Design a protein with these regions (language model features):
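Noncatalytic modules at the cell exterior or secretory-pathway interfaces
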Residues: 32-33, 147-153, 193-208
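C-terminal interaction-tip segments
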Residues: 1-29, 46-48, 197-199, 205-213
């Protein structure tokens, strides 16, 4: 017999929330229904999207990346200079507060060529806050339709510390769907179903804070 389970997300807002929380699907699963309910007294828009199983998808899955330095390499979320896959339409925050950055006089940055060759530093949609290597320092990167398909993260002072960033599209099941106050949007009802693969992630997002169940 087939097992069924129900997973609930509460008070989803503008930051995408994933099911299972902070994890990939660990097997091929069948999804037979998705219910997106507006918990507010105002109309909202809501989205549901998938990210596919690919190398290093666990890095930046929550749109936050912790940056440290070890062995002459940038370490991102515990992995040594991994290639990154980022999704268009979202903003990623790189935590660059670790003293392993400042102690080696490293500077984390983006470029359109490896190691920032040929003065190729990339600053479009990039916002830096604080001083790298000190508390609360961060860099945000807004990935849009105009972001180059391939970028690089690198150290402005030392070569060979970074890797590639690939910008790609998330797979939307529904995008910016209007949901009136007190109403819900139901997907896949009526016998329809969707099979997700091991390693996939499913995200939900609302146009306003804490408005989607």
């Amino acid at each position: 017999a087939q097992d069924f389970e129900r997973t609930k997300l509460t008070a989803v807002g503008t930051t995408p929330s994933d099911i299972p929380t902070s994890a990939d699907f660990d097997s091929d699963d069948t999804i037979i229904g998705i219910n997106m309910a507006n918990r507010t007294a105002n109309s909202i828009t809501a989205s549901c999207f998938m990210t596919s199983n690919q190398a290093n998808d666990d890095i930046a899955f929550d749109f936050n990346i912790t940056v440290t330095v070890a062995g002459g390499n940038f370490i991102l979320d515990g992995q040594t200079k991994p290639a990154l896959v980022l999704y268009r339409g979202f903003t990623y925050t790189f935590d660059v507060s670790s003293n392993t950055i400042s102690s080696g006089s490293h500077v984390f940055a983006f470029a359109t060529e490896a190691d920032g060759a040929n003065s190729s530093g990339y600053t479009t949609g990039v916002t830096a806050t604080g001083t790298q290597g000190q508390a609360n320092a961060k860099i945000t990167l807004q990935v849009t339709d105009s972001t180059p398909e391939t970028l690089y993260y690198y150290c402005t002072a030392h070569s060979g510390m970074g890797n590639t960033i690939t910008s790609t599209n998330a797979h939307f099941i529904v995008k910016d769907a209007p949901i009136p106050a007190g109403s819900a949007l139901q997907l896949l009802d009526g016998g329809a179903k969707m099979v997700v693969q091991n390693g996939d992630r499913m995200f939900f997002q609302s146009s306003t804070a804490s408005s989607l169940d």
